[in-house]
Amino acid sequence: MSLDIVILAAGQGTRMRSALPKVLHPVANKPMLGHVIDTARSLQPQSIQVVIGHGADTVRERLAADDLNFVIQAEQLGTGHAVAQALPQLSAERVLILYGDVPLIETATLQRLLALVSDDQLGLLTVELADPTGYGRIVRDDSGVVQAIVEHKDASDAQRQIREGNTGILAVPGKRLADWLGRLSNSNAQGEYYLTDVIAMAVADGLTVATERAADEMEVLGANDRIQLAQLECHYQQRMARRLMAQGVTLRDPHRFDVRGQVSVGRDVTIDINVILEGKVVIEDDVQIGPNCVIKDSVLRKGAIVKANSHLDGAEMGEGADCGPFARLRPGSKLGAKAHVGNFVELKNAVMGEGAKAGHLSYLGDAEIGARSNIGAGTITCNYDGANKFRTVMGEDVFIGSNSALVAPVMLGDRATTGAGSVVTSDVPADTLAVGRAKQRNIEGWKRPTKK
């Protein structure tokens, strides 16, 4: 059966106390609405309608995509009114209504919900709540059949004792929706057009209201303030930690680990505390990541080791390579197999060949370093002249003496050597020693200045 999805994202979110529209507040570095859109896409609908209102231009600009249609709700008159704004765009056999501030809803849950929908049956997602305050209550008859949803403010004392709450997520037969929305009334405590009133209409029209239960409260929690936003973040991170551990990853402490993107992992990976994985990260078998590391949009090949307090962004580490502690690999950096980058070494758009080493205290930018070459402490590639960047190219088995400055553009042939403290401004042929420093002069009988 064909499917249209409507995502309600027009709310202001005053309790966030923020100029940013509520649905753009992030969970795991992605807007809450972005998570919901990703889940919607996984269901392969024929259209996704996003109903926006408060901060509409900002929301549209942030999340615009070819497969999204944004619909304006000029006045926030309730959830039923919001869905009605999208009606002209809906033509599928089934319509699923989601919420832009409920980012943890799972694809599998929604698939089960959609399986309930037929011409004479709709699907309602409910949840068992420890404290249902504020939630609409699911009212059933003596045989357990759903009769209506009663909003908290309109509920009687007896109805407020019900712990089964409405999540707001609803899947309905598309051909029925326009009729139901057209019959909504705002005669209630809020003076709004409640989407939940559709349930009583469906029952009156002879349809069955089938229910699917969410796994837990967190899956359907919406973020109305920053406290709930933090709860969502914590739950998301624990969910990701469990998934990675199930795939063969050892997390030293799952409560001190963050995923903020897409992560692919191999087996027997070990990750220490306070590690952040951002963007698209690929981690192969037997990789070890030390504490306090940030790894973004990077690839770690089999057996790579990232030592404590290192930062990788857009980098690739070859099989058996290692870096750190306190290493920084910036975009375009690539370490060959068994290459070594030590403490306080920064690479930017630099490629190190197999077995090459830069042990400590160096900046290597816009550079190509051949296999087995050794970079002495304090080496700098001087790649910027104030207007343009230039490359430094080293062959294989090159030895760079400590505290050398390589002024690009410059090339060093295979097995070239530079003396410690040299400033290299021209190419060095293969098998050649380059020494570029002032001759030492000793002054005998030198007396240090004294204070006056």
Swiss-Prot record:
It comes from the Bacteria. Mg(2+) binds at D101, N224. It is an enzyme of class 2 (transferase). GO terms for biological process: cell morphogenesis; cell wall organization; lipid A biosynthetic process; peptidoglycan biosynthetic process; regulation of cell shape; UDP-N-acetylglucosamine biosynthetic process. One of its GO terms (cellular component) is membrane. UDP-N-acetyl-alpha-D-glucosamine binds at residues 8-11, 22, 73, 78-79, 99-101, 136, 151, 166, 224, 330, 348, 363, 374. Residues 1-226 are annotated as: Pyrophosphorylase. Acetyl-CoA binds at A377, N383, Y384, S402, A420, R437. Pathway: Nucleotide-sugar biosynthesis; UDP-N-acetyl-alpha-D-glucosamine biosynthesis; N-acetyl-alpha-D-glucosamine 1-phosphate from alpha-D-glucosamine 6-phosphate (route II): step 2/2; Nucleotide-sugar biosynthesis; UDP-N-acetyl-alpha-D-glucosamine biosynthesis; UDP-N-acetyl-alpha-D-glucosamine from N-acetyl-alpha-D-glucosamine 1-phosphate: step 1/1; Bacterial outer membrane biogenesis; LPS lipid A biosynthesis. InterPro entries: Bifunctional_GlmU, GlmU-like, GlmU_C_LbH, Hexapep, MobA-like_NTP_Trfase, Nucleotide-diphossugar_trans, Trimer_LpxA-like_sf. The active site is at H360. It is found in: Cytoplasm. Residues 227-247 are annotated as: Linker. Its EC number is 2.7.7.23, 2.3.1.157. Residues 248-452 are annotated as: N-acetyltransferase. Keywords: Acyltransferase, Cell shape, Cell wall biogenesis/degradation, Cytoplasm, Magnesium, Metal-binding, Multifunctional enzyme, Nucleotidyltransferase, Peptidoglycan synthesis, Repeat, Transferase. Its cofactor is Mg(2+). Pfam families: Hexapep (PF00132), NTP_transf_3 (PF12804). Its main location: cytoplasm. In the N-terminal section; belongs to the N-acetylglucosamine-1-phosphate uridyltransferase family. PANTHER family: BIFUNCTIONAL PROTEIN GLMU (PTHR43584:SF3), NUCLEOTIDYL TRANSFERASE (PTHR43584). Homotrimer. HAMAP family: GlmU. This is Bifunctional protein GlmU. It comes from Ectopseudomonas mendocina (strain ymp) (Pseudomonas mendocina).
